[in-house]
Amino acid sequence: MKQNPLGILMLDTRFPRIVGDVGNAASYDFPVIFRRMEGIGSADAVAAHPDRPRVLAALKANAEALATEGAVGLGTSCGFLALYQADLAAVSPVPVATSALLHIAKLPQRRVGVI
């Protein structure tokens, strides 16, 4: 049975993606499609004054491209993109989870440590 792929939106970064990293295809036992958002690095997304319109435009365009390529859901390579969850989910043709940090809200009355 053919599995539909997960799409991964990646910031334009250049560092080794070891097995276990979201940006390494060998980390998955199912199909994954990666899209690097050319020209959108971590500083663009989370600087003191990020260029939100440019980042959102890149997220939207690449989300649409991944959906067109068959992705049935999207994740990202950087938890910083959690800042864009609501905006991206509103325009993405498929479900989006930008960061595992989204699960913090499901831990009411618990102490959470984020490093």
Model-derived features with residue positions:
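N-terminal glycine-rich anion-binding loop in soluble enzyme alpha/beta folds
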Residues: 1-56
